[in-house]
Amino acid sequence: MKRTDADIPGPGVGTVSVEMFNLKLDNPADALRGEVVGADARLVRRRIRLDGVGFGELLGITDLDMANPYDISPAGGVASEARLTGTVPGAREPATVVVTLRLVNGTFHMRPSQLINVAAGEEQTVLDGFTFDLDTRELPLGGPADLVQLRGGSFELSRDRVNTVVEPADLEPLAGASTLGKHD
C-alpha cells in the first residue's frame, strides 16, 4: 500500500492511497523489492480520505466536525450517514445535521436527513449548506467511485478493480486518472 497526503483536484487536501490484495507473483521476493507491475491481483483499491478540514473546505465551512451519527467514539465505525456540525455560509451560528452519503452513476450526493440543532429561521440556509454533489470521475480514483462511507471522522471515497493486473499507475496514488479508459 502507498499512501500520501496531497492536494486533490476539487476537494483540496486529503489522503490518497492505493492498496493491492492477494498478489500472484512468480517470485515472492518481488514483493519485497516492490516489483509488482504485471502481477495478477485479486483487488486494487484506490481511496481518498477527507477529514473535517478537507471536506469543510469544499463546503465553505471552516469549523466542520464530522462523526458517525450512531457511534461518536473516536473509532466511530463505518456508516453511510454522517453527523455534521459547523457554520454553513450565511448562517449566524453552528448547526448540527445528519446527512446521507450516496453514490448515483458516479456522482456523490450528500443530503440532510435530520436537523438536530439549528437556529430558528436558519433551517433553509442549513439545508442548502449541507447539500452537496461531486462527480467522482474527476478524482484520482481511476474512474467513478463505487463506495462512499464515513470512517472514524473522515469521508472515504474508493474504487475497486477486481481480478486485475497491476499497472505502473497503480504504484502512485495520484496517477489514478491515467487508468480511467482501461477499467470502465
Give the location of each predicted region.
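N-terminal beta-strand/beta-hairpin edge segment
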Residues: 1-68, 77-86
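Short helix-loop boundary/capping segments
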Residues: 72, 76-123
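A short, surface-exposed beta-strand/turn
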Residues: 16-26, 99-104, 173-184
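Solvent-exposed coil/turn segments that connect beta secondary-structure elements
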Residues: 4, 21-23, 87-89, 102-106, ...
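Amphipathic hydrophobic-ligand
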Residues: 10-17, 92-96, 140-142
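Short beta-strands and strand-coil junctions in structured, solvent-facing domains, enriched
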Residues: 6-8, 91-93, 157, 165
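Extracytoplasmic/luminal low-complexity segments enriched in Pro/Gly and acidic/polar residues
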Residues: 118-184
